[in-house]
Regions:
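Noncatalytic carbohydrate-binding groove/subsite architecture in carbohydrate-active enzymes
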Residues: 122-132, 164-286
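Aromatic/acidic polysaccharide-binding cleft in carbohydrate-active enzymes
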Residues: 259-334, 339-351
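Carbohydrate-binding surface patches
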Residues: 345-400, 438
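Acidic (Asp/Glu)-rich catalytic clusters
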Residues: 53-58, 82-89, 102-118, 132-142, ...
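C-terminal motif of bacterial Sec signal peptides marking the signal peptidase cleavage site
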Residues: 25-26
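Conserved, mostly hydrophobic/aromatic
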Residues: 95, 214, 252, 281, ...
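Boundary/entry segment of secreted carbohydrate-active catalytic domains
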Residues: 37-101
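C-terminal beta-strand-rich structural cap/linker in extracellular carbohydrate-active enzymes
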Residues: 416-448
């Protein structure tokens, strides 16, 4: 409300001066508003943060598998004919195995090292001096040592110097850590913290400072999709032991294929869930994921889920999950030194419910956008596969892209389709997203 008339009646002697003052005040307000508008127009708009690509090879390097190379009465006994050549064929660079004192076992680890596969060894009560001696013997072939494996489970009967879980676990981890740290030859070897069989038992163990890398065994329960419980259960419990800042590895995770068991899923569902599990954990910053396990240990005669976790059947024939992972690794591997990473100005529109994504880049400048539906591909109650219809979405890109090449690793290493768009520029594409990884290779226009 303008109070100028009241002021004028009260101060008639000063009417002229007040009139001038009011006029000048109004003018100044108008100028201020005009300046404000002008300034706002001149300021650059706040730029949205564009999705930043991660190194394609860092994704490939984040995958490992569990092995049991000393179980020579199982399929692992066929090291030369199946295990070694199939590990090489898969293309992984990391395995996890037990810390056994066995020269034949050591020789196998050294052989794998010569073809680019490093090992982490688990020690669950071995004398700490023995751990140091083993680490020295296998120097260069092992990349980390790991503390007690699921010592909270009665099944493993863990005990150290008469102490069981949790006291014995803490004591052993501390003494193993100390022995490795004081020896000049092993002090730089990373040490992985203990794993829990049941995540909630992390509360009993508490924070453990004697290690460099956190650990979790993140098996999705009851045939559920890979994201089930990862954010609400597995990672929080692991962080109870490791704290908030140390890198986190999942040293065991996966699915078995004995479908009569509550935890079992079909091989078809495994080819969908296992690559998605890897992607989902990578998206959450889990630095390494070790699938359990590489091969079915024995032919399934009695119906045992434990014998059906393999990516390979016991005769060495590949399950669909093995082939899918092999194709994904072959497509995305890109070893070499670090390089500048780009961002991608893009947006998915349409029905994007449950459509998840990962953006990667190779050193040649090509970007790889991986899309999948994070949905239930297996009905655990009915024990059957679920047919998931592709989700139709639109990919809109402001970053200049000259070509898009699509791959479906579950089917082939070869392209499914490609698009060059109009005038050599792809701005918008209709995409059908399945419940398994769809890899879109995006070639920047500047490369043409």
């Amino acid at each position: 409300m303008n109070n100028f008339p009241k002021l004028l009646n009260r101060y008639k002697p000063y009417a002229l001066s007040l009139l001038i003052a009011n006029f000048l005040f109004a003018c100044s307000q108008q100028v201020a508003v005009t300046e404000s508008i002008f300034t706002a127009q001149q300021k650059p708009s706040v730029q949205k943060k564009l999705p930043q690509a991660r190194s394609s090879d860092s994704f490939v390097d984040s995958l490992g598998v569990n092995t049991h190379l000393t179980y020579t009465d199982t399929a692992y006994g066929k090291f030369d004919n199946i295990i070694k050549p199939k590990l090489k064929e898969l293309g992984i660079r990391h395995i996890r195995d037990g810390g056994y004192q066995d020269q034949t076992f050591f020789d196998k680890i050294k052989q794998l090292n010569r073809i680019g596969i490093k090992t982490i060894l688990i020690f669950s009560g071995n004398p700490p001096q023995e751990v140091v001696a083993t680490a020295k013997t296998l120097k260069g072939a092992i990349e980390a040592v790991e503390g007690p494996n699921e010592s909270d489970l009665e099944h493993f009967k863990f005990s150290y110097n008469g102490q069981k879980f949790p006291e014995g676990t803490r004591t052993y981890q501390k003494e193993m850590f100390t022995e490795l740290e004081v020896d000049p030859e092993t002090k730089s070897l990373p040490i992985i913290l203990p794993s829990m069989g049941w995540g909630e038992n992390a509360q009993k163990l508490g924070y453990v400072p004697w290690g460099d890398i956190g650990n979790m065994h993140s098996y999705p329960n009851l045939g559920n999709p890979p994201t089930e419980d990862i954010d609400s259960y597995f990672i929080p419990h692991a962080r109870t032991i490791t704290g908030k800042t140390k890198p986190l590895w999942s040293t065991e995770t996966g699915y078995h294929n004995y479908i009569k068991d509550d935890l079992g899923i079909s091989e078809r569902a495994g080819a969908r869930y296992i690559p998605r599990l890897w992607l989902e954990q990578f998206n959450r910053g889990v630095k390494r994921v070790y699938l359990y396990e590489f091969i079915n240990q024995r032919p399934d005669k009695e119906g045992d889920g434990q014998n059906n976790y393999g990516l390979l059947r016991s005769d060495g024939s590949p399950k669909p999950s093995f082939t899918t992972l092999k194709n994904l690794i072959s497509l995305l591997k890109d070893p070499g030194s670090s390089f500048p990473l780009k961002s991608l100005d893009y947006k998915l529109s349409g029905n994007t419910t449950d459509v998840h994504q990962t953006l990667l880049q190779k050193r040649d400048g090509n970007l790889y956008l991986i899309l999948w539906q994070e949905v239930r591909s297996w009905d655990n109650k009915k024990k059957k596969d679920v047919a998931i219809a592709d989700r139709k979405v639109t990919l809109n890109m402001n970053t200049p892209i000259s070509q898009v090449v699509a791959y479906q690793p579950i089917r082939s290493i070869n392209p499914s389709w490609r698009s060059t768009g109009k005038a050599g520029r792809v701005k918008q594409l209709s995409i059908s997203v399945p419940d398994h990884p769809l890899v879109l290779k995006l070639v920047p226009a500047s490369k043409k």
